[in-house]
Structures are given as C-alpha cells and as structure tokens.
Amino acid sequence: MSETVVESFTLDHTKVKAPYVRVIETQAGPNGGSITNYDLRLTQPNETSIETGGLHTLEHLFAGLVRDEIDGIIDMSPFGCRTGFHVISWVNYDSETLAKVFKKVLEKIVSDEVTEVPAAEIESCGNYKDHSLHSAKEWAKIILAQGISSDAFERKIV
C-alpha cells in the first residue's frame, strides 16, 4: 500500500455539489513554472455517471473547444469514476474563469454547430467505436440546466 497522500482520495465525495470546477492543487516545477490540476465534476459522485461513449465524446470535443477558448491547457482526462475530468494547465486560472469557459463550451456542444465527433477514426483514436455525440449533447444539456458552480461545496453558479 502506498504512503502517498492522493488529494482526490481525501476529498469527501458526499459533501461536493456537482457540477462544479475546483482547484485540486498547483505544483511548482523543479526548474520554475507551475501546473495546476482542476476537478471538473459534471455529475454527482456516487449518484450518477456518464457512460463511456458520452464521456469519450465529451473528451474529444473538450480537447479542441476548450483550447479554442483559453490558453495553457495541457490535458483533460476523464476520471475513472466517469463523473468528470482532470484539467491540467500551465496557467493558474481561478475556478470561476474555468467554470465560465466550460459553460461556454457546453453551450457550443448542444448547439447545431457541433455535428460530428472530432478524431473518431481508427487512425486517431484508441477506441474509435466507443463514441456517442447524442449522449454528449444530452449530458451537456443536463449539466447546463443544473448550472456549473465555481465552488465544489456551495452552489455559486456562473
């Protein structure tokens, strides 16, 4: 058993109120610079989760659409529990800024502007058969209807 303390394992998942964005941590690099890890929680932990096709499609859509809105995004990786994403950035944004960005991106996803899943071919995706644009759009609608909070424990909808 590892002795390393993993922040997400110390988070009381029964106390958070999804959807939200929160800063998990900012780490300084050994040669300067820093990266920040965010918790983009889209569904309430232990109550519901996004099926893999919808989550996988959101991942592909976020990859381009979020980077179109802000600089410094290194990676967006889905949580294994399928309730949201880690968002890694070399820019230290506050939670409210990122919540507004994800609201805007989700609004684009539900619009008629998004009609296909980017990079959903065998050459560009490791599981190209597991996508659902319909599911991604439906989840985006649900998340927008609930509102995205800039605080994990108190609803501060942006």
Swiss-Prot record:
E.C. code: 4.4.1.21
Reported cofactor(s): Fe cation
Keyword DNA damage attached: no
UniProt record, GO biological process: quorum sensing
GO MF annotation terms: iron ion binding; S-ribosylhomocysteine lyase activity
Keyword entries, A-Z: Autoinducer synthesis, Iron, Lyase, Metal-binding, Quorum sensing
Subunit structure: Homodimer.
Protein name: S-ribosylhomocysteine lyase
Lineage: Bacteria, Bacillati, Bacillota, Bacilli, Lactobacillales
Gene that encodes it: luxS
